[in-house]
A protein has these predicted regions:
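Solvent-exposed, non-transmembrane amphipathic alpha-helical segments
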Residues: 58, 80-81, 88-91, 123, ...
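Conserved ATP-binding subdomain of kinase catalytic cores across diverse folds
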Residues: 1-114, 137-141, 154-155, 162
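C-lobe/activation-segment region of protein kinase-like
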Residues: 163-166, 170-186
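Conserved kinase catalytic-core segment
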Residues: 109-171
Length: 186
């Protein structure tokens, strides 16, 4: 499961992302505030189904112990929407469902790992292998060099942006595993 939070303050648009993610402050049920990178239905390439796939994959990653930022169900109120002055974001929020998906903002110090960063530690190598297996299992074709959705602080990774997981219609030759003989070649 994941916690519900309510958007209380718009900060800014994120610099990357086709789905037009935004950075907002949200309030937990207990009143604590948390910075959240949130996506809403109107900005999704893949309809609201992309947000559902993203939430499912994030919860599964969390349950498997993979390095995923804390996921949230983000609620937006008419008062929050009215407080947003950025016209593009205002348009996005007005045309979206009133619940979106969010991830706890990563702390400063996370960035893209490159070969020039030096050799990975054994711990990072193991995490990279686990993330690769997870992405292969969920058919995530969106984690690639030109899409920085796997970041590191040198000690651990953080994976996010799972909207393109579970999209079996994009996989040539994919067969539902519950059909007799579908896994015969494996």
């Amino acid at each position: 499961m994941f916690d519900s939070v309510e958007a209380v303050r718009f900060d800014r648009e994120m610099s990357n992302g086709r789905t037009k993610p935004i950075l907002i402050n949200c309030e937990r049920i207990n009143g604590d505030e948390v910075e959240v990178v949130a996506k809403f239905s109107f900005g999704c390439d893949n309809s609201p189904n992309g947000l559902i796939r993203e939430a499912l994959a994030a919860m599964l990653a969390k349950d498997l112990g993979l390095p995923v930022p804390e996921p949230f169900l983000v609620s937006i109120t008419p008062e929050f929407i009215a407080s947003v002055e950025n016209q593009a974001v205002l348009h996005l929020l007005k045309n979206s469902n009133k619940h979106g998906f969010g991830s706890h903002k990563l702390p400063d110090g996370f960035g893209v790992w490159t070969a020039s960063s030096g050799r990975m530690s054994k711990k990072l190598e193991q995490e990279a292998l686990e993330v690769f297996a997870f992405d292969a299992w969920l058919t995530n074709a969106d984690r690639r060099i030109k899409n920085p959705n796997l970041l590191t602080d040198g000690r651990s990774f953080a994976i996010f942006d799972h909207e393109y997981t579970l999209m079996t219609d994009l996989n040539l030759g994919w067969q539902p595993p519950w059909i007799q003989g579908a896994l015969a070649g494996f």
